[in-house]
Amino acid sequence: MYDILKQPQKGEKDITDYDAFSVGLKLHSEGITAKHPVVMIPGVISTGLESWGTHKNSRQYFRKRLWGGWSMMRALVADKEEWKRHVMLDKYTGLDPPNVKLRASQGFDAADFFITGYWIWSKILENLAAIGYDPQTSYTAAYDWRLSYANMEVRDQYFTRLKMHIETAVKIEKKKVVLASHSMGGQVLFYFFHWVAHKSGGNAGESWVDENIEAWINISGCMLGTAKGLPAVLSGEMKDTAQLNAFAVAGIERFLGREERAEIFRAMPGISSMLPIGGDAVWGDMNSAPDDKPGQNVSYGAFLNFRNHNSSHAQRNMTVQQSLEYLLNTTEPWYQDMIKGSYSNGVAHTKAEVDANEDDPIKWINPLETRLPLAPNLKIYCFYGILPPFTPIKSLFTTN
């Protein structure tokens, strides 16, 4: 743990490196300046969560971050059970548990760093500032990523506030807004596009996106979910589950067992929005997968690999679709109900299905079941890393 604690010292030095602004300064020297207002939608776990509860058990944490920052690690070490009680949502309502009130941190501080030395949005903020952006022309639309998308509106009116902020920016700046989303933020934004137009949501009509949004910059958006999401809620796996640095991963893994971690992740319905979408049609089956390479012995379509502790030969593999079914068959009823009532992972095959799904909020995160907004002038830019090292097949060990 001491070695991990030393890591932020190097990060602090990196933060002050004058090259941090180099991209923005180069663009500025070429005549590039701020034009459209910018709204940033962070990804999963990257927004800090702070306590606003005043119950006697919460007063010690008042306005301290229980997710993100050093106060999170201190709280976890000092009183693990109390920390768990605060960060987990009510398993049946998906909202705040009794006498607990955690809210997303706001402003640029909400998602610039997860912990000292581990930057998330800070580099983008630095370079936006270098071409003239400031708090009047840029905004971080932080949200409580633990909530299901429907409950983001129920509890925090997140989508209503996002709509109002965009409209205000357009009115003041006389230019349409550019949206930049990361990871889960891409799904949140896709849901928002449906919500804002629908009569049961923002009721702004189909033309709203075209009238208010210049472009959407989708940075590593998990539009079809992510392979990491399933092992997280199934077994509490964290090694490549979330955007955490080595310190946070080591700290959480050291103080929380796998079962505890799985319980926590299941009690954060927002994380389950990133379960793989499209089933075997997208992710492959036992025989082949889109990302298989020539001569590969085992297809990446075999997503989960179960091995018996007592026999190296006894094993069975599961595709993504089978893995999702296994998850729902082996988890608690409250979790099954939450998943089925919040998200859809299927595929629509006809225009009639797609049109009908516009009236079903459960489908709004799924680009395989719903359409893009009716915005012919909207520009969409997608940024992804290519060929990063990864482990496509997850192994779960069992004695049964």
Regions found by a protein language model. Name each.
Residues 1-180, 184-258, 262-265, 272-300, ...:
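N-terminal non-catalytic accessory region
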Residues 34, 267, 373-376:
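A generic structural signal for short, non-catalytic loop/turn and secondary-structure boundary residues
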Residues 306-400:
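C-terminal subdomain of alpha/beta-hydrolase-fold enzymes, centered on the catalytic histidine
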